[in-house]
Amino acid sequence: MDEINKNFCYVENFLTKEELEFFSIYAQMYHRSNENSFDEDQTKLGETMQVYGTATETLLLLKTKKINKILETKVLPTYSYWRMYTKFSQLDKHTDRKSCEITASVNLGGCGTKWPLFIDGKEVNIKPGDAVIYHGVEKLHWREEFQG
């Protein structure tokens, strides 16, 4: 917990190879159906996002024990959110809502283009299957425009 109090905690192999493959395929299939890509302003570029999705809520529950062990404290899972970014997408500078005191940003795969997450101005390149854990309500975080 001390590590994320200072900055953030980078976790290699947060997802198993099988979990990564499953969620990568799931996200691509969901994106192709594009069921909700126009429901929110943030998805105006044809992006796909999902809050409280069955697959990601399952992942959230499965990974809570792992996060508890990493942080050496008990956390309470609140919600899951995933987004498939497309060319020219960006993640505006923000902090998370109060219910997301601790954030785990996980790379579910992609096209291989380097696209860092910035946490309080520090560049973090998250590899597929890896995660970065940080205080989302306290740490300003964002991504610049995606060129991939």
Annotate each predicted stretch with a short phrase:
Residues 10-11, 76-77, 133-134:
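A structural signal for short, well-ordered beta-strand segments and their strand-loop junctions
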Residues 62-66, 81, 103:
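Generic beta-strand or strand-like secondary-structure segments
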Residues 85-138, 142:
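Catalytic core of non-heme Fe(II) oxygenases with the double-stranded beta-helix
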Residues 1-71:
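Non-heme Fe(II)/2-oxoglutarate
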Residues 144-148:
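Short, compositionally biased
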Residues 72-81:
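A short coil-to-beta-strand element that immediately follows conserved catalytic motifs
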Residues 16, 80-83:
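Residue-level "edge-of-site" marker
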